[in-house]
From Swiss-Prot:
Similarity comment: family membership: Belongs to the tRNA pseudouridine synthase TruA family.
Assigned EC number: 5.4.99.12
Superkingdom assignment: Bacteria
Subunit structure: Homodimer.
Gene: truA
Disulfide bond annotation, renumbered to this chain: none
Protein source organism: Xylella fastidiosa (strain M12)
HAMAP family: TruA (MF_00171)
Active site feature: D53
Catalytic activity: uridine(38/39/40) in tRNA = pseudouridine(38/39/40) in tRNA
Gene3D superfamilies, A to Z: Pseudouridine synthase I, catalytic domain, C-terminal subdomain, Pseudouridine synthase I, catalytic domain, N-terminal subdomain
Full protein name: tRNA pseudouridine synthase A
BP GO annotations: tRNA pseudouridine synthesis
Amino acid sequence: MMRYALGVEYDGSEFLGWQQLGEMGPSVQATLQQALASVADASVRVVCAGRTDAGVHGQCQVVHFDSAVTRPPRAWILGTTTRLPSSVAVRWCVPTSEDFHARFSACARRYRYRLLNRQVRPALQHQFLSWERYPLDAQAMHVAAQMLLGENDFSAFRSAQCQALHARRELQAISVRRDAEVIEICVQANAFLHHMVRNIVGSLLMVGTGERPMEWIAELLAGRDRTMAGPTASARGLVFVGPLYPEKWHLPMEVSV
């Protein structure tokens, strides 16, 4: 058996999320596995670096799979992508060792959230942008966000459906910046809880509108009470940028540190 790592890009708008959940609806995982199976002429199971929810997009999701069929990377890339819908594409393929694991070998994961901040909702690229009509103070949001850095208990930003054994995560970097009418929030952590990024964004938006002071974010973190935090932000503006791996795995530079 040969193990391969793939970099996958997808528009999550029409999927019920990454994970295959029986016959409930289309998932990115099931769609990718079906295409890979056609190339391998055998069933294929993929393991991803980080599962995404319904409507969340992937810029460079990393997966691994095992196959008894040997194919050059180009054949896996082109053969699989031609069998995928236009909303999913394989960006790269790297043969790797059997001890590489897309999830457990990753040392960090990155997300990006983008929203349009103007009175009128977006018509172009609306599936990739959230929207907030009230003026936002991006600088205040950025300052407040820095209070979340470090290893903390993120229970205040954890969904009720989260199945993680504990809520401690290391938030390694977070930034909020404005580019004209678009506000971009970038987050990096060793791992994330269910809805963690969207719940953080929802709370930061309340700081941005002036509804809450910057110090409120630190109070939420210390309080560990989800009911006291802001609402869950829309999935529409969220992109899983991708995981990061140690250089020893010899993956493309965009996922290596």
